[in-house]
Amino acid sequence: NTVDWSDSSIETVTFKQEGTNFTGSLLVGHATSGTLNAAENNTGVGIDALDALTTGDSNTAVGFQAASTLTSGTNNTFLGKEAGKIVSNSSNNTAIGGNSLFYNTTSSNNTALGKNSVFGLTGADNTAVGYQSLKGVANQNGNSNTALGSGSGLAMTTGANNIFIGKSSGDNITTGDGNVIIGSINADSATGDKQLILADGVDGSVAWIKGDSNGQVK
């Protein structure tokens, strides 16, 4: 079913619920509201939200152009302006915040909470909590990273299996793997692997413990 209405404050709004190819789905947009084809149990609210969805099921997108290019992914949640905008065929992702998980096209199992979190990474199994956490660079395949704190893991590109805890922790690491950075501090090397740093959580001026890839603690 489609309903259009106009008044002094609403120019043109399109509303679709149930009906052919809309089983269990609800789309509310502006001028158009998607073209579901054998897709079920989806909810899209906002201009162009879920606009390209064809066969994906159980997706929720709320916000201007949220998941606007998603075609066949399942079990995704995107909340915020352009959250998951470039996602096309990904599943089991959660992105909350404007531009979160923006460039992730086909990878799954990511969690991004905070504006610009996991903005550029296209990898899978990343978890980021905080403004610009794991923001990265557009179309870089970082995988299995965890970042907790505003700006943590900010510069990540192709690094994997890293853990960053604290505001701006490890925000210089780009391609390093298996690093653990706790506290507001940079890693010794942006490309190094298996670096361990435990620092104070204020400004990172004091590193209490450091370890290297050989298991040596400094």
Residue ranges and their predicted role:
Residues 3, 9-218:
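Glycine- and small/polar-enriched repetitive beta-structure motifs of secreted/surface proteins
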